[in-house]
């Protein structure tokens, strides 16, 4: 497993070289809107080491009916529903702008079956402006009805289908709703994944106090933010203990201390998600705080706790 340099903060996800270990979570930072608002200054001081796009699908999607968001006491429940312009719209309109960012571009894709995933990976993987592809495997397979990232029997054949289609790094985004996230990680690794990212949001809902009915238009959504951090840390530890693949840890990262906790659990990099909605400068702040913590810690050339799966037992419990 790749370590983070304590002197430069540099790290690596597969063949993707990163100046520091802080990324954005897909769909949590609108780089195109930020570029319009801040112009060249954003490029000069971009807050993330790589940019992960919103998830795109083959066909355009309007997303779920409103309301789509519920502010929980320690997080956010979203039921966005993957609204996007579709593959053609993304390539024509968004990709040319995102390609001007001063960091590697990771494009997140989701298909409702192997054929859709294959079309997306072939098209995006062939574009020289794209550095890596994140596979959002939280969608159901239209043939089996199963979520492709929830069961190893779904994840393995998907990766075996996609791996020969591109030489770009494939990052598989794992769902915390899987019955055995470690087994799904094993399947992704066996299928040829270059890295893993986790966690995605936790299934959740909210009730409208006035009506007693679900608040969200789609009924249910996904919980993110500080409320899921402890769960995310545990699952990152489980996965890091079972694979040598780089792991991007996410789920409630608000500070450099949170980021360091994920690195200690075995992550190679971290992603800031929900915190971006509260503080658009969160990525840069987390990076600075992390650097200060590491400098005060007196580590050597690499953060020794990173990639130390012996801290987590094979059964998934944190060793005392």
Which sequence ranges carry the predicted segments?
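Hydrophobic faces of well-ordered beta-strands that scaffold small-molecule active sites
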Residues: 22-26, 49-53, 105-109, 133-135, ...
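Catalytic cores of alpha/beta
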Residues: 33-40, 117-127, 178-191, 241-243, ...
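Glycine-rich phosphate-binding active-site loops on the catalytic face of alpha/beta enzymes
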Residues: 53-58, 136-139, 195-205, 252-253, ...
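C-terminal helical cap(s) of enzyme catalytic domains, especially alpha/beta-barrels
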Residues: 64-73, 207-221, 263, 275-300
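Glycine/Thr-rich beta-alpha phosphate-binding loop at enzyme active sites
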Residues: 76-77, 139-153, 184-245
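Extended, intrinsically disordered, low-complexity segments
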Residues: 229, 284, 288-320
């Amino acid at each position: 497993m790749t370590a983070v340099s304590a002197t430069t903060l540099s790290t690596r996800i597969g063949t993707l070289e990163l100046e520091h270990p802080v990324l954005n979570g897909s769909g949590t930072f609108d780089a195109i809107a930020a570029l319009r608002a801040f112009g060249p200054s954003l490029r000069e001081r971009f807050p993330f080491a790589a940019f992960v796009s919103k998830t795109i699908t083959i066909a355009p999607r309007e997303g779920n009916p409103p309301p789509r968001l519920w502010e929980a006491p320690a997080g956010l429940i979203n039921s966005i529903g993957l609204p996007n312009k579709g593959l053609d719209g993304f390539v024509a309109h968004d990709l040319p702008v995102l390609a001007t960012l001063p960091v590697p571009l990771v494009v997140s894709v989701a298909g409702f079956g192997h054929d859709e995933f294959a079309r997306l990976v072939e098209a995006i993987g062939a574009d020289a402006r794209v550095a890596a592809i994140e596979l959002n495997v939280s969608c159901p397979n239209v043939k089996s009805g199963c979520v492709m990232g929830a069961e190893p029997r779904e994840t393995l054949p998907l990766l075996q289908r996609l791996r020969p289609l591109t030489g770009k790094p494939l990052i598989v985004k794992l769902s915390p709703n899987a019955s055995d996230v470690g087994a799904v990680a094993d399947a992704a690794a066996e299928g040829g994944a270059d890295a893993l990212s986790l966690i995605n949001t936790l299934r959740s809902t909210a009730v409208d106090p006035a009506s007693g009915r679900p608040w969200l238009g789609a009924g249910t959504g996904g919980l993110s933010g500080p409320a899921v951090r402890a769960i995310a840390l545990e699952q990152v530890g489980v996965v890091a203990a079972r694979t040598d693949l780089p792991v991007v840890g996410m789920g409630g990262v608000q500070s450099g201390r949170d980021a360091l906790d994920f690195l200690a659990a075995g992550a190679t990099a971290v992603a800031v998600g929900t915190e971006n909605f509260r503080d658009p400068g969160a990525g840069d702040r987390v990076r600075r705080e992390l650097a200060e913590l590491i400098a005060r810690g007196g580590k050597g050339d690499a953060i020794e706790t990173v990639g130390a799966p012996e801290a987590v037992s094979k059964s998934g419990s944190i060793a005392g």
